[in-house]
Amino acid sequence: MTKEKKSFHLHMLSDATGETLISVGRAVASQYTTYQATEHIYPMIRNKIQLEKALDEIKQEPGIVLYTMIDEELKLLLQKICKKIKIPCIDILHPVLNAFQSYLGTPTHLRVSAQHDLNADYFRRIEALDFTIEHDDGQSSSNLFEADVILVGISRTSKTPTSIYLANRGIKTANVPLIPNIDLPESLLEAKNSLIIGLIASAERISHIRQNRDLGEGFAFDNYTNRINIAEELIYAKRICERFGWPVIDVTRRSIEETAAAIFELLSRFREEK
């Protein structure tokens, strides 16, 4: 019998979008498997009125408070109220900034313009996500040259989820299927400023994934899931990548995050060499 999780309130305040804060909060909360966090998120806290509204809710539902704010007056007010109602209040950037300051021997100068950098990063990721969705599975191939990364591979090699993951990190990503006897789009071969990477996996893994996919009536399902056919598709994909000098990543035993990490490393080298 599964025990019901205990709940607690997790308040996260930021003078920006709060995405870094949320990621940290959720990562830590997930370590406590017998507890369930009730999240209260307060982004774009820029003035005392906005902070006081958040504080009203914190007083009603006390819990752990995490924050990232530059304004010293707002930080002091938040810390004062949390101390008064006896709840933890943690500035998640403070120890990191202190470590940088200590190691570099240079005091930290927090700047308001850093907020604009955060906003620019947020919109860059939104733009990348829009591009990636538009260029999923070979769609909108006419402007592939705008992509930072183009993933190629046969069906069920994690091209789409990997593309979405990269887009959420601000990388414009397109993915193009490699299908035997189907010509590659000219726009793919002309994308000289994009890093093109082949994704492959074992025939066993691909067959297993394909068997769990409903493709509707009239589809040649046996051919699609047959390991011998899949092995031939993989040989074709490898030959294409070898022909054009595209690096290949085997995703058989990699998580999406691990695949993305390998892509980031390749992208860094690619940009250095340009």
UniProtKB/Swiss-Prot annotation:
Which family does this protein fall into?
Answer: Belongs to the pyruvate, phosphate/water dikinase regulatory protein family. PDRP subfamily.
Q: Which domain of life is it from?
A: Bacteria
Which keywords appear in this protein's UniProt record, sorted alphabetically? Kinase, Nucleotide-binding, Serine/threonine-protein kinase, Transferase
Entry's EC annotation? 2.7.11.32, 2.7.4.27
Q: Does the keyword Ribosomal protein apply?
A: no
Taxonomic placement:
Bacteria, Pseudomonadati, Pseudomonadota, Alphaproteobacteria, Hyphomicrobiales
Originating species: Bartonella tribocorum (strain CIP 105476 / IBS 506)
Name recorded for this polypeptide: Putative pyruvate, phosphate dikinase regulatory protein
Q: Which PANTHER family match?
A: PYRUVATE, PHOSPHATE DIKINASE REGULATORY PROTEIN 1, CHLOROPLASTIC (PTHR31756:SF3)
